[in-house]
């Protein structure tokens, strides 16, 4: 866990982050005429699209608005060696809970980044592959739960992010493509 907090601190110190606090609320009536309030945040929209690893020949993630994703071994070949599947995006305190990140750890990160990184920059992206192409061959029938991944995704700005893959223990510096 200290390693993960170190990653978040490094992002905060090196890149800086712009956050917003715009949350809109909408009132929705349920079938029994009880009024409920739903928080509609647009934070997830900022991570949608393609994110390429800054490493030479690095992997490429595409997060879609319909809760699907693609993971490509390389952005230079989008026809082979890729997964596609379903994803769930958790944001803020929900992401922290899922990943086991404490408020104390985030507070330390916020302080070390001069309050440029905060809870609104933290995401948990749960990836569940449903389709696999490897070496030009459909290998979907080989997928098991061990292929599910969980990412800590720290949004830096509209062009930069950092991710830590809890499943593989890999760290990625990502650039919006």
Language model region names:
Residues 1-21:
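Sec-dependent N-terminal signal peptides of Gram-positive bacterial secreted proteins and lipoproteins
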Residues 7-9, 32, 92, 158-160:
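Short, intrinsically disordered, low-complexity terminal segments
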Residues 15-34, 38:
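Sec-dependent signal peptide cleavage junction
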Residues 30, 175-177:
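Short, solvent-exposed mixed-charge patches
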Residues 34-50, 62-64:
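N-terminal helix-cap/turn-to-beta initiation motif at the start of protein domains
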Residues 54-58, 75-159, 166-175:
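Contiguous, well-ordered beta-strand patches that form the walls/edges
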Residues 67-69, 159:
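Structural signal for glycine-centered tight turns and loop->strand junctions in beta-sheet-rich domains
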């Amino acid at each position: 866990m200290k390693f993960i907090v170190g990653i978040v601190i490094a992002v905060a110190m090196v890149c800086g982050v712009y956050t917003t606090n715009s949350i809109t609320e909408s009132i929705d009536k349920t079938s029994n005429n009880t009024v409920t309030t739903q928080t509609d945040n647009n934070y997830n929209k900022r991570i949608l699209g393609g994110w390429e690893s800054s490493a030479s020949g690095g992997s490429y993630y595409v997060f879609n608005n319909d809760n699907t994703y693609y993971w490509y071994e390389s952005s230079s070949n989008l026809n082979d060696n890729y997964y596609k599947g379903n994803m769930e995006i958790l944001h803020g305190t929900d992401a922290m809970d899922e990943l086991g990140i404490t408020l104390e750890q985030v507070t330390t990160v916020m302080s070390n980044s001069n309050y440029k990184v905060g809870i609104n920059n933290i995401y948990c992206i749960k990836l569940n592959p449903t389709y696999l192409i490897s070496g030009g061959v459909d290998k979907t029938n080989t997928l098991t739960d061990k292929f599910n991944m969980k990412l800590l995704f720290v949004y830096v700005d509209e062009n930069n992010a950092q991710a830590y893959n809890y499943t593989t223990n890999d760290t990625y510096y990502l650039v919006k493509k």
